Amino acid sequence: MSAQAQMRALLDQLMGTARDGDETRQRVKFTDDRVCKSHLLDCCPHDILAGTRMDLGECTKIHDLALRADYEIASKERDLFFELDAMDHLESFIAECDRRTELAKKRLAETQEEISAEVSAKAEKVHELNEEIGKLLAKAEQLGAEGNVDESQKILMEVEKVRAKKKEAEEEYRNSMPASSFQQQKLRVCEVCSAYLGLHDNDRRLADHFGGKLHLGFIQIREKLDQLRKTVAEKQEKRNQDRLRRREEREREERLGRRSGSRTRDRRRSRSRDRRRRRSRSTSRERRKFSRSRSRDRYRRHRSRSRSHSRGHRRASRDRSTKYKFSRERSLREESWEYGRNERGPTDWRLENSNGKTASRRSEEKEAGEI
């Protein structure tokens, strides 16, 4: 990569996709499924193991330092939970690496000469000391490259102590088996990167292995996987607590709502009961008032009819008595007239005929008119 390309990549990593107003680069967002989430978290095995014996080539997903910068800016404002995707990716990769390690162990067990359990334990001890020496030498070289010479010298002194222990372990291993078998190279599979290690490897070979990019890359991947598992577990626990708290708050609000609703219903029922009671009393009062009014009306109509009947009866009685009195008087007058007619003579008849009425008749009619 040229110096200009390196500067461009550095600017992308620092400022993101919109560092120079390029709209075409913003068409793909870091949230796109085509973007590698492990790359955004700086733990993609394709980047870490690039240039090693186990180079995986280019990743099938998009790798862009500018998108990583965009993600780092956005992750400060809200949680995107990309750790879960990266954890799944690394778990599948480490599972494949562990599978290769088990296959290598099985192949060694089939090809190498069988040894006793005691000899195997002594050989395992030599391997562990070799591994410790290689790690210490790699750490000393790293500290020396960083300029921390004093710490590097202290680690080299520890390396000398471990070398003495290794020499004693090799003597025990040599004395426990025949010379012909001891000269045979005993291999061991590295538990971290599944590479082969020899029992008689020198310190330089061990330092190159444990300080090499392949072994350190696998250590970085495994440590990142452990960190992601811890982060995901913490976030899931926090999410569960938030969900539980929201559920409790919702249940508390529902209980308060039910209590408030119950009190409201009780008040509503009480008011409705009072209204019904007042309405019932008012209806009863109106009914009694109406009943009394109807009773009074009936009583008044009855009395009116009674009075009318009494007046009519009295009027009829008077009419009948008057009529009876008139008929009685008339009959008496007629009887008296008949009697007087029989007693009067021709002169009286002529006078009556000339006047049309007798004096007694005229007096009777006058009396009847006055009545």
UniProtKB/Swiss-Prot annotation:
| Record field: compositional bias (Basic and acidic residues) | 232-257, 318-351, 361-371
Task: Name the keywords, alphabetized.
Answer: Coiled coil, Phosphoprotein
Give GO MF terms, alphabetically.
Answer: identical protein binding; mRNA binding; RS domain binding
Coiled-coil stretches are 87-177, 220-256
Where do the record's region annotations for Disordered lie? 232-371
Q: Which residues carry this modification: Phosphoserine?
A: S336, S363
Q: Name one GO cellular component term.
A: nucleus
Single GO BP term: negative regulation of striated muscle tissue development
Q: Which Pfam families match?
A: LUC7
Compositional bias segments (type: Basic residues): 258-317
Does Cytoplasm appear among the keywords?
no
Task: Identify the PANTHER family for this entry.
Answer: RNA-BINDING PROTEIN LUC7-RELATED
Question: What family is it from?
Answer: Belongs to the Luc7 family.
The entry's function note states: May bind to RNA via its Arg/Ser-rich domain.
Its recorded name reads Putative RNA-binding protein Luc7-like 1
